[in-house]
Amino acid sequence: MKYAVVLVVIGLSLSAVAAEHGPVFGLATPTNSKGEWSFDEGVFGRNTSLGSQASVRELVAYGFTPHLTLSFTLPVVVGNTPLPPTRIQPGDDFDSTVSWRFQHRATKVGTRFESTAFAGLAVPGPQSGFNGIAHTTNVPGTMFGVVTGMASLSNYVWIGSTYTKFYEHNGDKRPDVLDYSLVYGYRPPKWRRPPDKWDWRLFGELVGERSNRFLQANVPVADTQAHQVFIGPTALGIFHNYTVSFGAQFPVYQNVGTTFPKEHVRFAVNFSYLLFQHGH
């Protein structure tokens, strides 16, 4: 599938989008307000010299408190291009994630320092196999992570990481995945608008992910490890309870086993609707 695209909700970072000022690819600290539902879907793609992979994914999130959000994702994959395992990008796993903002400190009007921890369960779906690479198990994996940063009326900075561990079954095991991200955002003063007009932000996002080798019959599968770093621009617009975000990323570092093709570009467009919104 030469130029496939993906309808997706951007996993962990969607909590940030639902909070009205989050990046597309990287991690961020905001959580849903108390009683706030968010519903997301979008378009996402990973293109390589061998083609692209597409997926359809929906995300639903709910804020139990101003600092605690629970989210669920449901994916459908189109295409069978062999790609390195990914967690910071949307894939073909069913996810449930708890986001806990354990630090929230305001220093002046419009400026705050925050830290958020993540814990989740990744359940491989029926399309999660890596055909032609290794026989994989559908045993769920566990995810833990943290992100910290600063947000003001004009500037945003976040740095974070998550680690997803998959478990062995009958000698077979999917690779564990470490991902990390650094995000800077800017909201120009002239772009600050009231809720009845579009309010825009720009982001520069750097993300990386490293996965070890597949395990089959208790033997590591050669040339299935991967470490990639991507960087690129994204944008977020807000209008009433609706948000749209989009962007692209390009590789700046790739150390990928010969089993996989190297990715040329990643791109995304995400849409979000917020229901029963309250202040933090």
Predicted features and spans:
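Short loop/turn motifs that connect adjacent beta-strands in outer-membrane beta-barrel proteins
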Residues: 28-35, 50, 67, 104-114, ...
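Short glycine/proline- and aromatic-enriched beta-strand/turn motifs that initiate or cap beta-hairpins
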Residues: 18-61
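Outer membrane beta-barrel transmembrane domains
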Residues: 182-280
